[in-house]
UniProtKB/Swiss-Prot annotation:
Keywords: Chaperone, Cytoplasm, Stress response
HAMAP family xrefs: GrpE
Family: Belongs to the GrpE family.
Location of this chain's protein in the cell: Cytoplasm
Species the sequence originates in: Myxococcus xanthus (strain DK1622)
A GO molecular-function annotation: protein homodimerization activity
Lineage: Bacteria, Pseudomonadati, Myxococcota, Myxococcia, Myxococcales
Name assigned to this protein: Protein GrpE
PROSITE patterns: GRPE (PS01071)
Low complexity biased stretches: 16-33, 218-245
Assembly mode: Homodimer.
Pfam families: GrpE
One of the protein's GO biological processes: protein folding
Function per UniProt: Participates actively in the response to hyperosmotic and heat shock by preventing the aggregation of stress-denatured proteins, in association with DnaK and GrpE. It is the nucleotide exchange factor for DnaK and may function as a thermosensor. Unfolded proteins bind initially to DnaJ; upon interaction with the DnaJ-bound protein, DnaK hydrolyzes its bound ATP, resulting in the formation of a stable complex. GrpE releases ADP from DnaK; ATP binding to DnaK triggers the release of the substrate protein, thus completing the reaction cycle.
């Protein structure tokens, strides 16, 4: 076929060319239109499923959060109840302690009093015996026994006396009220004990009042008698007037 034949076989006018091409153009768009709705439906379904999954996850998290809040509320409620109970227990303990303190202040010396009452009974018996019998020896023995029972009663409560006579003076446990010169006791030692000291459970409750020894003062030496003039001193005194005479002779010779 020649070129002239090809050109003759093609469309002669633009309208014919458009008419010949129109069937192909009208058939292609419907295929695209048919595919679009199915893709949209699939995308919508996928989005719905995603939203449902997110909703279920959010609901699950919400239920979990609510459960945690409920548990936290229960724990807070229990903690508050415990705090209220502890506060009540503390208040009750404070009241009991205050009551016990008041009882100790009022009746703390009850045991000591029970131990001292027999001492008073012994003193009453000693006074009655002295009134009935003037025997001083028996009275002295009774007083000594009463004193011993009194000291034993104090000892049961931790009270203990101590002797200071002959000891080195210690200002921590001794109170000096006087000093005395004596050679019988070393200086700085206790010569006499006026009042005994006492301990209460190793604590000093009263120092011992004592008189402290001091070394006797040395005697003052006797005054020496005045010195007597010696004879040699007298001779010197007699020779003293001779000097002026000699001076007179010497003065005459010079004349």
């Amino acid at each position: 076929m020649t070129v002239i034949e090809v050109e003759a076989s093609g469309p002669s006018t633009p309208v014919e060319a458009e008419a010949s091409a129109s069937p192909a153009d009208t058939t292609s768009p419907p295929s695209d239109a048919e595919a679009t709705p199915s893709e949209d439906v699939a995308a919508l379904r996928q989005e719905v499923e995603s939203l449902k999954a997110q909703l279920e996850f959010s609901q699950a998290k919400g239920r979990e959060t609510m459960e945690r809040l409920r548990e936290a509320h229960e724990r807070a409620k229990e903690a508050q109840e415990r705090t209220v109970r502890h506060a009540a227990d503390l208040e009750n303990y404070r009241k009991r302690a205050q009551k016990e303190k008041e009882e100790v202040q009022r009746f703390g010396s009850e045991k000591l009093l029970k131990d001292l009452l027999p001492v008073m009974d012994n003193l009453d018996r000693a006074i009655d015996a002295a009134a009935k019998s003037p025997d001083l020896d028996s009275f002295e023995k009774g007083v000594a026994m009463t004193r011993k029972s009194f000291e034993d009663a104090l000892g049961r409560h931790g009270v203990k006396g101590f002797s200071a006579k002959g000891q080195v003076f210690d200002p921590r446990v001794h109170e000096a009220i006087q000093q005395v010169e004596t050679a019988d006791v070393p200086a700085g030692h206790v010569a006499y004990e006026v009042v005994r000291g006492f301990y209460l459970n190793e604590r000093l409750v009263r120092p011992a009042m004592v008189v402290v020894a001091r070394a006797p003062a040395e005697p003052v030496a006797a005054a020496e008698p005045p010195a007597v003039a010696e004879p040699a001193t007298a001779t010197t005194d007699t020779e003293a007037p001779a000097a002026p005479a000699q001076s007179e002779n010497s003065s005459g010779g010079s004349q």
